[in-house]
């Protein structure tokens, strides 16, 4: 029987949102899961699993599938948004009228605002006001492994210390899911956006056939780009050596569960952008993130040569091999002070 209030309302019933809802419910919490497609929600309720992406993971009894947005939002004090970054602002506008006076917002979306490159915290503040507590979770997480209960660790940053502790307690499970609090709200957000871009580059490199040396060099210099941009925005450099930085970057650049990596591999193998996106069949966050990270880097005058070349491939039709040669042919640099 459903209680008066759930521990968490998850907005976004894709693979990752569903995996997080399953994890919370498996921890013994009542969780409400809402998605924008009523037919899809009805199918989730009928099957009691996500047949498309997580067919082997049954929903715990405490996971409640909800089709009505107002009911989903008011069911819990804490609202977890797990949607693609390009619709993040639109979703906040949708949920705003239904938020409770004591609502708190957390998101697992990795990216920046479409076109503007703004951090999602700025979108949330502009849309929902200054008083609502905000938080973000990020780190090396593939939905299938998380839903299956395989060991996973993430970073959590919040604007409010009490909210951070509450979320850590809700999410943390000693058997499989470890949650690290991190006070760097900017850095935890930024890492998840930049790693998507670098993962496309790693995929391109492997698709061309450049080998492990090249992939590792690209990951390492990609981390340098992430750190430079973070420093310009006031992030803590240590964050980028943690779960939301290096952890997520390595995972996304090296494992074929990553859509961004697979997308890049197809480009390196000769697919055009549209064909590669169609073949993936799900949102490739790094495609839009590349444009937005470039905008943000230009705003802060941060040199990001890998990001620039990936942008040239995705939006200007540059050949992937030519992009790689452009990177290799750059002038000599000092490792710690050059781009």
UniProtKB/Swiss-Prot annotation:
Main location, first listed in the record: cytoplasm
Keywords on record: Cytoplasm, Lipid biosynthesis, Lipid metabolism, NAD, NADP, Nucleotide-binding, Oxidoreductase, Phospholipid biosynthesis, Phospholipid metabolism
Active site, renumbered: 195
Reactions that this protein is recorded to catalyse: sn-glycerol 3-phosphate + NAD(+) = dihydroxyacetone phosphate + NADH + H(+); sn-glycerol 3-phosphate + NADP(+) = dihydroxyacetone phosphate + NADPH + H(+)
One term of GO molecular function: glycerol-3-phosphate dehydrogenase [NAD(P)+] activity
Location within or outside the cell: Cytoplasm
Pathway participation: Membrane lipid metabolism; glycerophospholipid metabolism
GO BP: carbohydrate metabolic process; glycerol-3-phosphate biosynthetic process; glycerol-3-phosphate catabolic process; glycerophospholipid biosynthetic process
Pfam families noted in UniProt: NAD_Gly3P_dh_C (PF07479), NAD_Gly3P_dh_N (PF01210)
Residues at which NADPH binds: 15-16, 36, 110, 143, 259, 283, 285
Binding positions for sn-glycerol 3-phosphate per the UniProt entry: 110, 139, 141, 195, 248, 258-260
InterPro entries documented for this protein: 6-PGluconate_DH-like_C_sf, 6PGD_dom2, G3P_DH_NAD-dep, G3P_DH_NAD-dep_C, G3P_DH_NAD-dep_N, NAD(P)-bd_dom_sf
Source organism superkingdom: Bacteria
GO CC annotation terms, alphabetical: cytosol
EC code(s) of this entry: 1.1.1.94
Family: Belongs to the NAD-dependent glycerol-3-phosphate dehydrogenase family.
Cited NCBIfam families: PRK00094.1-1 (NF000939), PRK00094.1-2 (NF000940), PRK00094.1-4 (NF000942)
Job description of the protein: Catalyzes the reduction of the glycolytic intermediate dihydroxyacetone phosphate (DHAP) to sn-glycerol 3-phosphate (G3P), the key precursor for phospholipid synthesis.
Protein's name according to its UniProt entry: Glycerol-3-phosphate dehydrogenase [NAD(P)+]
Gene field: gpsA
């Amino acid at each position: 029987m459903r209680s008066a209030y759930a521990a968490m309302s998850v907005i976004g019933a894709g693979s990752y949102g569903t995996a997080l809802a399953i994890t919370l419910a498996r921890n013994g919490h009542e969780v409400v899961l809402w998605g924008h497609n009523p037919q899809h929600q009805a199918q989730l309720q009928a099957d009691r699993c996500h047949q498309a992406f997580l067919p082997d993971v049954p929903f715990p009894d405490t996971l409640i599938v909800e089709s009505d947005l107002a009911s989903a939002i008011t069911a819990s004090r804490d609202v977890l948004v797990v949607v693609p970054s390009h619709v993040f602002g639109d979703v906040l506008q949708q949920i705003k009228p239904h938020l409770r006076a004591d609502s708190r917002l957390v998101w697992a979306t990795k990216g920046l605002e479409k076109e503007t490159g703004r951090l999602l915290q700025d979108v949330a503040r502009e849309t929902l006001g200054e008083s609502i507590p905000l938080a973000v979770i990020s780190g090396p997480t593939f939905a299938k492994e998380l839903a299956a209960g395989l060991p996973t660790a993430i970073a959590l940053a919040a604007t409010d210390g009490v909210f951070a502790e509450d979320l850590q307690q809700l999410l943390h499970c000693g058997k499989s899911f470890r949650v690290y609090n991190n006070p760097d709200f900017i850095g935890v957000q930024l890492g998840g956006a930049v790693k998507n871009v670098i993962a496309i580059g790693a995929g391109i490199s492997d698709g061309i056939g450049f080998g492990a040396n090249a992939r590792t060099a690209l990951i390492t210099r990609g981390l340098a780009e992430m750190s430079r941009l973070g420093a310009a925005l006031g992030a803590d450099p240590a964050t980028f050596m943690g779960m939301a930085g290096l952890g997520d970057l390595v995972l996304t650049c090296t494992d074929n569960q990553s859509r961004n990596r697979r997308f890049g591999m197809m480009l390196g193998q000769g697919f055009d952008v549209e064909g590669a996106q169609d073949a993936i069949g799900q949102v490739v966050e790094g495609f839009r993130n590349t444009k937005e990270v470039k905008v943000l880097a230009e705003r802060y005058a941060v040199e990001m040569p890998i990001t620039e070349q990936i942008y040239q491939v995705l939006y200007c039709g540059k050949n992937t091999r030519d992009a790689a040669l452009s990177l290799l042919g750059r002038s000599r640099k000092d490792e710690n002070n050059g781009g």
